Structure formats: structure tokens, C-alpha cells
Regions:
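Short, flexible turn/loop "capping" segments at secondary-structure junctions
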Residues: 30, 62-63, 131, 174-176
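Alpha-helix N-cap/N′ positions at the starts of helices
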Residues: 65, 88, 110, 174-177
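Short linear motifs at protein or domain termini
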Residues: 1-94, 98, 140, 206, ...
């Protein structure tokens, strides 16, 4: 944290704390104080105060008067998020198929190639990273800012659960097949099929994350 640039310090503190809460580094019920975070992160109170305010708006923490209590993501939150993703992510794939450019095609192809490479190596850590990139890229390729602005924060909040899913190789194998089918639909310009496949993918992910089905 000590080498962060001052112009984006509050944003970077927010990203750090948000990620640590979502990943479970800060546990639900844990109390965070400005002094504690100053000591841990090596920054002043001002960016920490701004980050805490934003985290409270995201309902990841709540102010107790003596500090900020971590709320994290509950099972009910996860279910709500996945239900929203189920209804919106198909639209992102639909518009990505409609609006994809040559540059976008190259970027998406690169991500899919990386997924296949890391899958062949059983490299779970890099698979987690490119899984995030695959979904983020579809949002970007949609060209619809409202869709991207809605989905990307929700996907960040489920990152911890999605990354745990990579440890289940059967589910990971199915995810690879689903991603490739979505990719093929997008690059072929079949918007309706891309929407259908992306929606099905989220349905399957929701069943695994919430109900434990592969």
C-alpha cells in the first residue's frame, strides 16, 4: 500500500479492502477501525475514511459508532446476485455478438486461448484470473455501459465463491465447455444463441454455488 499513487489512493484502498472482505480475509462480524487500517495499510486516515464510506454504501460493512463491522456476502446475497446475473448476463452476450469488433474478437480469442492453455496445465490460479477476464470482456464487448456497470460489481462480489468452484475439476471442465460455446456463438454473430448459452451458464453456476450441483 505504501507505494500507491496519491491521485488514486482512495480507489486503491477501496479495492484492497473490498477484495479482502469478499475473499474472507476480514471475517463477517470483524470490527475494522481507521487506526487499525492505518497501521495495516500504511496510509493516512483520509483515503481509508473514503473507502469505508464506499464499502458501507456497498453494504459490505456497517458503522457501529466504534468502527465498521464486516458484513461480507451472505448466502441470501449470493442467491440474489446470481438471480440478477442470470437475467442480465445473457443480454451482455447478446449485445457482444451484435457489436463485436475485430479488436474485441482478438481480445476475447486471446482470453479463451489462455483458458484452454491453463486448463491443460491444471493451473487453477491462472484459470481463476482468466475466468474473471472472460466475463468482464463480454460485458465490455456488449458496448452497453449500464449492463457493464451493473454486472461487473456483482461479479466482483461473487469472486470468492466462483474461485472456490475452480477447485472442483468436474465443474471447471463443464465451465470450459460452456465458455467455449458462448465464445463460438459470439464470434459467429449468433446473438440469440449467445444469450441463451450465457443464461444457461449462469443457471448452472448458481446451482453449483448455492445448491452444490455440478
Amino acid at each position: 500500500m505504501r507505494n500507491y499513487k496519491s491521485t488514486s489512493l482512495a480507489d486503491q484502498v477501496f479495492d484492497k479492502l473490498e477484495n479482502d472482505i469478499i475473499q474472507g480475509i476480514y471475517q463477517r462480524g470483524e470490527l475494522l477501525t481507521e487506526l487499525k487500517l492505518v497501521e495495516q495499510l500504511g496510509v493516512s486516515r483520509t483515503p481509508i475514511r473514503e473507502a469505508l464510506r464506499r464499502l458501507e454504501q456497498e453494504r459490505l460493512i456497517e458503522d457501529t459508532g466504534k468502527g465498521s463491522r464486516v458484513l461480507g456476502i451472505t448466502k441470501e446475497d449470493l442467491e440474489d446476485i446470481m438471480n440478477i446475473r442470470q437475467r442480465i448476463e445473457g443480454l451482455a452476450a447478446y449485445y457482444a455478438a451484435k457489436n463485436i469488433t475485430p479488436d474485441g474478437l482478438r481480445e476475447l480469442t486471446h482470453i479463451v486461448d489462455l483458458q484452454e492453455f491453463y486448463f491443460s496445465k491444471h493451473d487453477k490460479e491462472h484459470l481463476r484470473q482468466v475466468d474473471d477476464e472472460f466475463h468482464d470482456m463480454i460485458c465490455a464487448l456488449s458496448g452497453r455501459s449500464v449492463i457493464a456497470d451493473t454486472l461487473i460489481p456483482l461479479m466482483r462480489k461473487t469472486r470468492r465463491y466462483r474461485r472456490v468452484a475452480i477447485d472442483n475439476w468436474e465443474r471447471t471442465t463443464r465451465t470450459m465447455h460452456e465458455h467455449h460455446a458462448i465464445f463460438e456463438a459470439i464470434v459467429s454473430g449468433n446473438a440469440e444463441l449467445a444469450e441463451e448459452l450465457a443464461t444457461e451458464h449462469i443457471v448452472h453456476s448458481k446451482r453449483y454455488l448455492i445448491e452444490g450441483e455440478n
